[in-house]
Amino acid sequence: MGFIQVFLLTTCLSKVYVVHCVEVDDIIADAIQDTYLKPQRDFGVGNDTIPETGNSFAFLQKQKNDEDTIARAGFKYLSFIKNLIQRSGKSFGDLESSDEYQRSFRTQLCDTITPSCKKYKYSSYRSADGLCNNLRNPTWGVALQAHARYLHPVYDDGYNSPRQRGRNGGVLPSPREISNKVLAGGVTTPPDDKRNLMLFTFGQFVDHDLTFTPIVVGRNGNTLDCCGVDASDPECYAIEIPTNDVRFPGRTCMDFSRSIPTPTDEGCSIGPRQQVNRLSSFIDAGMLYGDSKRFNENLNGRVGTLRTSSGDILPPGGICHTSQAEDFCQLAGDERSNEFPSLGGLHVVFLRLHNMIAKEIRQVTGLSSQDVFLETKKIMGAIMQQVAYGEYLPAILGKDTRKKFCLNLRRNGYWNKYNPNVNPTVKNVIATAALRYGHSQIPPELGYMTRMFAISRVFKSEDVFMDPNIVVTQQGQNIPDLARFLLGTPARKVDRQIENAARNELFPDVNGVTFDLMSFNIQRGRDHGLPAYNEWRKLCKLPVATTFSELQDHNSDTIARLQDVYDHVDDIDVFAGGISETPRADAVVGPLFECLLGWQFKELRFGDRYWYETKGIEGFSRGQLREIRKMTFSKILCETLNLDEIQKEVFNLVGSKNPRVKCSSLPFMDLSEWKKSFFPFVDWSRFFTSG
């Protein structure tokens, strides 16, 4: 008997545990053997282009070849948990709460090596994937790690099977039925009389800086056909379409694949299925650059700039469907840049801003191309934080919420409240529910608006999903007109009434088969084991309803619709309950999502060692910080799109309190402050760790 086993046995006997630890060791060892003897799920090499009959939305989300290792480890972990339950005769809950089993599990299976952060301690630049942002907990916020959680997941079997049962034991209603009955119908909500479509667009842009959850592929490496040949695959979780569905008559099934699994605690403890975030959990403009060294290098152009194509727009190489022969898919740091034209246009805006800054940094400092790229990338991350917290969050969260979660920026000086004990990792409920509030703002149409602010052309949203034509046509000459349309068109209010384009006409394939984004959101929450709506209200210290009539932040019509589809108030899915709340007067989202988003954005600030207001090598000099604070989203649009006029409050509609002003009257940062900085020679390549 080895030293560790003797130690464990002594510990067990001294505490008079019912099960001796040696027996526990044997049970776990047998479960390990069972796991490795059984064949594991395998993945082939999938297509790099969308199959002719495939769906671009699912193709975008499918796991990449370099994520196969993570998925394999996740499936092996789940297989082990299943075998351990069978071998031990215990429930998953008992195993998870057992000190003996957890201790033996760590001893026999945990081989995680904590990365060394010595070379990052004095680095001015964050790593591409977020590694060692936190020197004590190097993997917090890192790309390709599990989403963290505020609440323990609720799986039907405790650890893996999606949440499908309600409080009374009955099967939860189909997400499509919820979508039909709760998220549609009734009196149409009028457009927002204060905010514009640019708010929706920037919200999507920020979301793509923070979260991207890949889905499982089949054994051939391609997306699963869960309504066809792959229907029996355990990773299929197809959505049932009601027989009386008006939009999908004759269809009974909507394709849906589960998110790839990853172990709890990096495989060092017995726990439930977790989901992977492909991106780093920091506001660092990662959607421009990617979250790996490989992506950074692929997009890097000459003298520290990003690669472009004719018209100073993104280079070709992304994923999309093109409607015109001369069009091309745009390539950006995030694969979803072609998802919606307004998003694609914003990618062009920030691409141009990077290149403008890089060229001037090169001129005033004489730095090498690599150093110019790194310094410009750092500045762009700071600008993203400045706009996100200085303009975007004040537009969606109420004043009290921003104060409660310390989200207001300083006007001068440094902010020195970085806390290494704060885990910034994006939480599962944020990625899967709260940040999806913007799906309620998807407009029925996009368009162009001339310099005289007259609409010149309109496009139905369902016709432009995954089609970059509006952006790339005529080498991007119409992007300013698209921006004016976004600035001058009222936003949709965040409520239960979802646009037809998002609920019925999402991402049609070549056969005209479409999807329902709301059904996807509800099903994804169940796939991830998100607890029901009331549990999140409790977490946020909001009133919790015991009956439908006690729902406090829903109007009577919404309450009636929720009661019509759910058996019990405790069954309400968090997305359905959160998106249908009535926002407070100064907020865009309802109280629950306001709480969750405020909490997460606080962690993203307090838990980021490279937060731009920070003093030290991770931040900027006082002069540089002063210049960054001059930057506003309105001036960014002016400079990159050659606009003449714009409203100062860029996410609000033009009005007497928010008139258009000359772009020339808005300040821009003075990059001569960077000439005063001293850049010692450093081998910067060592700060890129991801392949």
Predicted feature locations:
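Cleavable N-terminal signal peptides of Sec/SRP-targeted secreted and luminal proteins
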Residues: 2-21
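N-terminal accessory/cap region of cofactor-dependent oxidoreductases and related radical enzymes
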Residues: 18-356, 360, 375-378, 382-519, ...
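Mobile, glycine-rich extracellular loop/lid and propeptide segments
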Residues: 369-372
